[in-house]
């Protein structure tokens, strides 16, 4: 039976569906009727559009393979995703490790990757920290704090939190000074190899606008810095740093094999390079990230490897096609 590729109509669905069509698959988008024209008229990448949050029976009848986006769990909920009957590209067990900051930290440390210090008690803050609420919300609610007093003032202002009992869904991380770098990887279970797909950095409001205001005016305005993501900027990394990034990806894949039965498909390590050229990672996104949308026509790194335009969305479709051709489809699905 013909396999079709499906995804929720959000985040990086345009790229995923375009890549699937480029590899000869029929495509399915599902979600809000409000966005239907985006996928069928303005950017006609969906052969089918189903106006439901999660149309399980229709997807099963269409022999769909669901490809998760970076906002998949945010829209559908982790319980629904873990229990869906439609074949899912990737390892669902990764979702718990990715969404739980303590498990995520355990994963990164097992991989031998430098991670920021974490404060369990805000009253112990003794250096600049960045405070992150639970869940992937594009940096919304993130804030900097320099000491306990500053933390509590901003926690109430941005998150409505006044008591320690309400802190269970936030993480207080050491703020590591450096250049933000977000390498995008793809691990092929068919080929058993890691690929560096592309690299980006985020464009965030208002932190990336602060520099346009003279320092004396910043002090007068008494502004609080926020980190809401509004877009992404491509990066070509210094060539001497590429092996650091690639080796970090290899170690994450190896640790995932031991902890949760493997990580395959696209993922991203979100971190910074310090002035000492140390790669410090503060988060992992174990699915396609929005930063790959810059590279719908491929990146410098995929061009070097494939000598043709290959986006992360297309690479997913290539993996599914190769799995079908090698009678390995069940091995890349859960």
From Swiss-Prot:
It is an enzyme of class 6 (ligase). It comes from the Archaea. 5-amino-1-(5-phospho-beta-D-ribosyl)imidazole-4-carboxamide binds at residues 10-11, 71, 75, 232. It catalyses: 5-amino-1-(5-phospho-beta-D-ribosyl)imidazole-4-carboxamide + formate + ATP = 5-formamido-1-(5-phospho-D-ribosyl)imidazole-4-carboxamide + ADP + phosphate. The keyword ATP-binding applies. Homotrimer and homohexamer. Keywords: ATP-binding, Ligase, Magnesium, Manganese, Metal-binding, Nucleotide-binding, Purine biosynthesis. Binds 1 Mg(2+) or Mn(2+) ion per subunit. Mg(2+) binds at residues 270, 283. Pfam families: DUF1246, DUF1297. One of its GO terms (molecular function) is magnesium ion binding. Its cofactor is Mg(2+); Mn(2+). Belongs to the phosphohexose mutase family. SUPFAM superfamilies: Glutathione synthetase ATP-binding domain-like, PreATP-grasp domain. ATP binds at residues 132-142, 173-176, 204. It comes from Pyrococcus furiosus (strain ATCC 43587 / DSM 3638 / JCM 8422 / Vc1). Pathway: Purine metabolism; IMP biosynthesis via de novo pathway; 5-formamido-1-(5-phospho-D-ribosyl)imidazole-4-carboxamide from 5-amino-1-(5-phospho-D-ribosyl)imidazole-4-carboxamide (formate route): step 1/1. Its EC number is 6.3.4.23. Residues 78-325 form the ATP-grasp domain. Catalyzes the ATP- and formate-dependent formylation of 5-aminoimidazole-4-carboxamide-1-beta-d-ribofuranosyl 5'-monophosphate (AICAR) to 5-formaminoimidazole-4-carboxamide-1-beta-d-ribofuranosyl 5'-monophosphate (FAICAR) in the absence of folates. This is 5-formaminoimidazole-4-carboxamide-1-(beta)-D-ribofuranosyl 5'-monophosphate synthetase. GO terms for biological process: 'de novo' IMP biosynthetic process.
